[in-house]
């Protein structure tokens, strides 16, 4: 007899501007995994499925089932600063979770909505989109604190063998206890991208913050190496050159395209503003002619 698994969350709705920030963050480096936290709200929706039978002049319910659908709405993300760069794993410190909770409270006051930390995301450069055993165990740990907590993975720098073009895959998951085992296994959660015409202020601030965070990570790594006393002068010069090279690469791959995108967006907004002003003038002329 098959055992039906009860999911804590039935679906995830990810705002397109938050999706854009996640994607830019995942594509910022192909050597190590990156990560961040998702800010949003968890809504409960009631779904009623009823079956009726008709006997003579009365209609009565044979079976009525009330299901509570839990949907996670992700409105923005917080890009986390990595204290330890690893190729195959990422970790969230308690200090980062606390700072994210404080930011969620600030957003809740601004929007008047019950914002909180509802999940986390990280990248899988050059590897499959499916979570590893470490990812599943980490997700299970977060769910012990919050059953509605979800995990997102962005697999990037993957090349299609047939078309020879790059592609990005993403998935959302939670962890469940495996049958007759102490281990955990993943369960996939349907994820839907909610389209937006404009990018929100909070997501725009996160996108602008990305180059700063990447620069801070490089500075921290360089300072740790530079503080070692046993290094000779040639090694220190080499480390300085590597540091400069990494910063230039970030400017070329992240800061430059981001600046160009912001300038293009500004030009589009100015053009749209001119069109609206022209439309306003035409409407005012029509209104004055009617008077």
UniProtKB/Swiss-Prot annotation:
InterPro entries: BRCC36_C, JAMM/MPN+_dom, JAMM_MPN+_peptidase_M67A, MPN, MPN_BRCC36. Its EC number is 3.4.19.-. The modification N-acetylalanine is found at residue 2. It is found in: Nucleus; Cytoplasm; Cytoplasm, Cytoskeleton, Spindle pole. Pfam families: BRCC36_C, JAB. One of its GO terms (biological process) is positive regulation of DNA repair. Binds 1 zinc ion per subunit. Keywords: Acetylation, Cell cycle, Cell division, Chromatin regulator, Cytoplasm, Cytoskeleton, DNA damage, DNA repair, Hydrolase, Metal-binding, Metalloprotease, Mitosis, Nucleus, Phosphoprotein, Protease, Ubl conjugation pathway, Zinc. Residues 12-179 form the MPN domain. PROSITE patterns: MPN. A motif (JAMM motif) lies at residues 122-135. The modification Phosphoserine is found at residue 233. Its main location: nucleus. GO terms for cellular component: BRCA1-A complex; BRISC complex; cytoplasm; nuclear ubiquitin ligase complex; nucleus; spindle pole; ubiquitin ligase complex. Zn(2+) binds at residues 122, 124, 135. It is an enzyme of class 3 (hydrolase). GO terms for molecular function: cysteine-type deubiquitinase activity; enzyme regulator activity; metal ion binding; metal-dependent deubiquitinase activity; metallopeptidase activity; polyubiquitin modification-dependent protein binding. Component of the ARISC complex, at least composed of UIMC1/RAP80, ABRAXAS1, BRCC3/BRCC36, BABAM2 and BABAM1/NBA1. Component of the BRCA1-A complex, at least composed of BRCA1, BARD1, UIMC1/RAP80, ABRAXAS1, BRCC3/BRCC36, BABAM2 and BABAM1/NBA1. In the BRCA1-A complex, interacts directly with ABRAXAS1 and BABAM2. Component of the BRISC complex, at least composed of ABRAXAS2, BRCC3/BRCC36, BABAM2 and BABAM1/NBA1. Identified in a complex with SHMT2 and the other subunits of the BRISC complex. In the BRISC complex, interacts directly with ABRAXAS2. Identified in a complex with ABRAXAS2 and NUMA1. Belongs to the peptidase M67A family. BRCC36 subfamily. This is Lys-63-specific deubiquitinase BRCC36.
């Amino acid at each position: 007899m098959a055992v039906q698994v009860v999911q804590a969350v039935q679906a995830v709705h990810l705002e397109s501007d938050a999706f854009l920030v996640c994607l830019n963050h995942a594509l910022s480096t192909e050597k190590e995994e990156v990560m961040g936290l998702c800010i949003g709200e968890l809504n409960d929706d009631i779904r009623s499925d009823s079956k009726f039978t008709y006997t003579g002049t009365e209609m009565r319910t044979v079976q009525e089932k009330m299901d509570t659908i839990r949907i996670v709405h992700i409105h923005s993300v917080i890009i986390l600063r990595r204290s330890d760069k690893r190729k195959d794993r990422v970790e969230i410190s308690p200090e980062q979770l606390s700072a994210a909770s404080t930011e969620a409270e600030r957003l809740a006051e601004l929007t008047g909505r019950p914002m909180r930390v509802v999940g986390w995301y990280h990248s899988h450069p050059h590897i499959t989109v499916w979570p590893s055993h470490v990812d599943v165990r980490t997700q299970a740990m977060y769910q012990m604190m919050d059953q509605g907590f979800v995990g997102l993975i962005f697999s990037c720098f993957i090349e299609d063998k047939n078309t020879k073009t790059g592609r990005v895959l993403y998935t959302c998951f939670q962890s469940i206890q495996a049958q007759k085992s102490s281990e955990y296994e993943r369960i996939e959660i349907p994820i839907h991208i909610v389209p937006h015409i404009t990018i929100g202020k909070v997501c725009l601030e996160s996108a602008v913050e990305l180059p700063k965070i990447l620069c801070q990570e490089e500075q921290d790594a360089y300072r740790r190496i530079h503080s070692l006393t046993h290094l000779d002068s040639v090694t220190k010069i080499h480390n300085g050159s590597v540091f400069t090279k990494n910063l230039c690469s970030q400017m070329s791959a992240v800061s430059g395209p981001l600046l160009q995108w912001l300038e293009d967006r500004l030009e589009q907004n100015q053009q749209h503003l001119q069109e609206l002003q022209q439309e306003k003038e035409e409407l005012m002329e029509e209104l004055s002619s009617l008077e």
